[in-house]
Each structure stands twice: as structure tokens, then as C-alpha cells.
């Protein structure tokens, strides 16, 4: 290794890495510099030395990129949640398309050099797009603060005005923190596993309805807090409590109870309505979700005699968009509340050709196949960990004719394509910017079974 810890070096940034950092070479050593942009010449200090690379802190930019902008967020550097806010937005979209190429070059699925990778679809107004927040709460001398941990630490950043967060949910979390302090509710700390740990607030774009979850290590009396919140925020329709007494980093425990209001809120996507219970997964960016799901529908190109499996179905949002166009839809999800929502949503919409089960896709789909069911269309929308090996093997043994992979992690997507391209051709990859100003992107992949 040609560098040592705390060494200060000049560096030319050759490209950007998948996490939004600048990458350069110093005496043939690969150096990652968060905050640096392609084409810049910087002065940096080595902060970490690994076997094959080093990380450095940006000290000074000697030659700025013409694509650099001043981040409009006052806590941009301190927070670290928006890794590329200093990059002009149209160039962010180019970067996200390139991230897909980088992932493919690393894993090299069959034929990757010839894949059609379409330009990333961005937002016309890439601010205040997050309709859901999950803020940690901590008490500092009796003063309750809510926010996120600084990147790579357990140091809470008090966030009062987040540029990418929905304005109403931000206003509500600010008030929640005040009320938790006012009524002296116990607040979690890592020495005493007791009190309120996290607050989740989600607003439905279509209805404007809001739901709130207090994640706490024990049962508490939230009556006074709820009374004030309901009086001040007429949009608030659901208040729930989730009990998580574990010492793990898991946000949620197994028990969720609605303590005030209705069981769910109402949302819409692709011109149909559905319900969201407090624990159910739904995309963070409702406006771009319309585009993401439209691209998925277009890519799968179903026929009326198709039997469709919607793996990782959540509340049924993607699958229900197909239900009126196919013979049947089957879906599964690991969250029982989401499956209950999916069943109720299908019933509400009048569909009788749907079937939903709670459980893992890698367990349920092989069982369905062993029972004689066959799907000729498959859509998967897995978590960031990608597809389970067991599910991949099932797909290889009995591949549906057509498949769409909706990915939230380009690395696991490229990894899974190594397996999937044994039986499928990749027609194209369409990325959609669901998280402006961050290094993350989502992608819709159209796959067709090989003849």
C-alpha cells in the first residue's frame, strides 16, 4: 500500500463510485473520496487504509467540476443522507445510469455488454418527495430531538427541515418531538432499553391522509400526545404503537396496535385505490412510483390468459395493476398485515382472480409449483438483498415465459442476472430516480425466456 493513515495527498478524480464518492489513483492505489466529483483535482487526507484501497476526507478542491452545485441543505455535510446533492441534477441522472453499467461490469451476466440501458427517468421537482419518514428520537438533558444518525455513526442529527422530506410529515415530527418532551415520556437510550425509540410518519399522496407509529420498547400512555396531534393536524387518521424491546438494530418489533383512528389510510397508484396499514411497505416517493409501476406494466406486457406471480407483493400494488388484464394473480409477502391489506384491496376493487399468502417467496412458490400451479408471467420486487438462492433455483427449474425484475439495489440485481440469464434474455433495463440527491436508483428489467 502506497499511502498511510492521515497522509495528505493531491488526487485527480477519474470517475464516481456506486455510493457517489469520487475515485482516483495515487501511486496505483485506489482512493475513494466522498464529496468529490469526476474531473476534479482535490487535496485530501487518508482516513482509512484497507488491503486493496483507501478512503480519504476531502480537504480542498483545487479544480472544481463545472457540474458541481452548492447543496441547498444546511445540514448536508453533517447528515450524509444525500450523497450527491452537490452534483447538478441532470448529471445525477447520468450517474445513476452509469451505476447500473458499473454493477454489470463487476458481475458480468451473460451478454451484459449489449444490454440496452435506458436513460434514468428523473423528477421535474426533485425536492420534498419522501412521503414517509422514520426518525430516531433521543433526549438530551430533557430536550427531545428527532432525526437520523450521521452516516456511519450513532450520533443523532437533529433534523428540523429536510429538503427531501414531505413538508407536512416534517412539520409533524417536529411537533411530536416537542410533545414527547412536554409530557415527559421516557425516551430510549442504548444503556437503558426503555422508552420511545423511533417515530414513523407516512402521508398518502392521493388522499392526504397521515398515519403515525410510535416504536417503543414498552407500553406507554400516549393519550395526551395524541389528543394534541389530532387537534393540530386534521390529516392524521391513524396512530399506532409498535413494541420493540430487542437490543438489535431492527426498527420494528412483532406487535403493532392501532391506538387511535382508522386501521389504514387510502392511497392511489395507476388510477386505482388501495389501503395501507401502518406496517405495510409502500414506496417512499409516490410521484415516481407512478412511473416505476407504469414501466413495470409496460415491460411485462401481459395477455388475458396469463397466470401471474407477484413476488414480494406488499399490499398488492403492482400485481393489482395487472389483475384486470390476466387470468389470475398470486402474491406473497413476509408481513402478514401487508397480505391482509392486499386481500382487502383486491376485494375492494372487485377482483376474484387473486390469491395472497403471508410468507417467503422462496418457500411459497416452490410449494405452489409442487401443487401443480404454473405461472407464465412473474414480477419480482425484492428487498435490497436481492433474490434468495432458493427462489432463483425455482425460477431456473420452471422459468415463466416472461419476467420483470424491479430492483432497488443495482449490485444485487447484477448478481442475480448472472443466474437469470441462464434461462432469460435481458431485453432492456430502465432506471427510475426514486431518491433524488442520493446515490440510490431503482430499475425495471424486462426479461424473456430463451427458446
Curated annotation (Swiss-Prot):
Q: Where does S-adenosyl-L-methionine bind?
A: 283, 312, 333, 381
Record carries keyword rRNA-binding: no
Every copy of the TRAM domain together lies at 2-60
Query: What keywords were assigned to this record?
Result: 4Fe-4S, Iron, Iron-sulfur, Metal-binding, Methyltransferase, S-adenosyl-L-methionine, Transferase
Q: What class of enzyme is it?
A: transferase
Molecular-function GO terms, alphabetical = 4 iron, 4 sulfur cluster binding; metal ion binding; rRNA (uridine-C5-)-methyltransferase activity
> What positions constitute the catalytic site?
408
Question: InterPro entries in the record, alphabetically?
Answer: MeTrfase_TrmA_AS, MeTrfase_TrmA_CS, NA-bd_OB-fold, SAM-dependent_MTases_sf, TRAM_dom, U5_MeTrfase_fam
Entry's family note: Belongs to the class I-like SAM-binding methyltransferase superfamily. RNA M5U methyltransferase family.
Residues annotated for [4Fe-4S] cluster binding in this entry: 73, 79, 82, 162
Q: What's the Enzyme Commission number for this chain? A: 2.1.1.-
Asked if the keyword Cell cycle belongs to this entry, the reply reads no
Highest rank taxon of the organism: Bacteria
Which species is this UniProt entry from? Streptococcus agalactiae serotype V (strain ATCC BAA-611 / 2603 V/R)
Under which name does UniProt file this protein?
Uncharacterized RNA methyltransferase SAG0413
Biological process annotations from GO: rRNA base methylation
Amino acid at each position: 500500500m502506497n499511502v498511510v493513515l492521515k497522509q495528505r495527498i493531491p488526487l485527480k478524480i477519474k470517475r464516481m463510485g456506486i455510493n457517489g464518492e469520487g475515485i482516483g489513483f495515487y501511486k496505483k492505489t485506489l482512493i475513494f473520496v466522498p464529496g468529490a466529483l469526476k474531473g476534479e483535482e482535490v487535496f485530501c487526507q487518508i482516513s482509512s487504509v484497507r488491503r486493496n484501497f483507501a478512503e480519504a476526507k476531502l480537504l480542498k478542491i483545487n479544480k472544481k467540476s463545472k457540474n458541481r452545485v452548492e447543496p441547498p441543505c444546511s445540514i448536508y455535510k453533517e447528515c450524509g443522507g444525500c450523497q450527491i446533492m452537490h452534483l447538478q441534477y441532470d448529471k445525477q441522472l447520468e450517474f445513476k445510469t452509469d451505476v447500473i453499467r458499473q454493477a454489470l461490469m463487476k458481475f458480468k451476466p451473460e451478454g451484459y455488454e449489449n444490454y440496452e440501458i435506458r436513460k434514468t427517468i428523473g423528477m421535474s421537482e426533485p425536492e420534498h418527495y419522501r412521503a414517509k419518514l422514520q426518525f430516531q428520537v433521543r433526549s438530551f438533558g430533557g430536550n427531545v430531538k428527532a432525526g437520523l444518525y450521521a452516516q456511519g455513526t450513532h450520533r443523532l442529527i437533529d433534523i428540523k427541515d429536510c429538503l427531501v422530506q414531505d413538508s407536512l410529515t416534517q412539520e409533524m415530527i417536529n411537533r411530536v418531538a416537542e410533545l414527547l418532551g412536554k409530557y415527559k415520556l421516557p425516551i430510549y437510550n442504548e444503556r437503558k432499553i426503555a422508552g420511545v425509540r423511533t417515530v414513523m410518519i407516512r402521508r398518502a399522496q392521493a388522499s392526504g391522509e397521515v398515519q403515525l407509529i410510535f416504536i417503543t420498547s414498552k407500553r406507554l400512555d400516549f393519550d395526551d400526545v395524541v389528543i394534541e396531534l389530532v387537534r393540530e393536524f386534521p390529516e392524521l387518521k391513524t396512530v399506532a404503537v409498535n413494541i420493540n424491546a430487542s437490543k438489535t438494530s431492527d426498527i420494528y418489533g412483532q406487535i403493532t396496535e392501532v391506538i387511535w383512528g382508522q386501521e389504514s389510510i387510502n392511497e392511489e397508484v395507476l388510477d386505482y385505490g388501495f389501503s395501507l396499514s401502518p406496517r405495510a411497505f409502500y414506496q417512499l416517493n409516490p410521484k415516481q412510483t407512478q412511473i416505476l409501476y407504469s414501466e413495470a406494466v409496460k415491460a411485462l406486457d401481459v395477455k388475458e390468459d396469463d397466470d401471474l406471480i407477484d413476488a414480494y407483493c406488499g399490499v398488492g400494488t403492482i400485481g393489482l395493476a395487472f389483475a384486470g388484464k390476466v387470468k389470475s394473480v398470486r402474491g406473497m409477502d413476509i408481513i402478514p398485515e401487508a397480505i391482509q391489506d392486499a386481500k382487502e384491496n383486491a376485494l375492494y376493487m372487485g377482483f376474484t382472480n387473486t390469491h395472497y399468502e403471508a410468507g417467503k417467496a422462496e418457500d411459497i412458490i416452490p410449494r405452489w409449483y409442487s401443487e401443480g400451479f404454473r405461472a407464465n408471467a412473474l414480477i419480482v420486487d425484492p428487498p435490497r438483498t436481492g433474490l434468495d438462492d432458493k427462489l432463483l433455483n425455482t425460477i431456473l427449474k420452471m422459468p415463466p415465459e416472461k419476467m420483470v425484475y424491479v430492483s432497488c439495489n443495482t449490485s444485487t440485481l447484477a448478481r442475480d442476472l448472472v443466474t437469470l440469464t441462464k434461462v432469460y434474455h435481458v431485453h432492456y433495463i430502465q432506471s427510475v430516480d426514486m431518491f433524488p440527491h442520493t446515490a440510490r436508483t431503482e430499475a425495471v428489467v424486462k426479461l424473456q425466456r430463451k427458446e
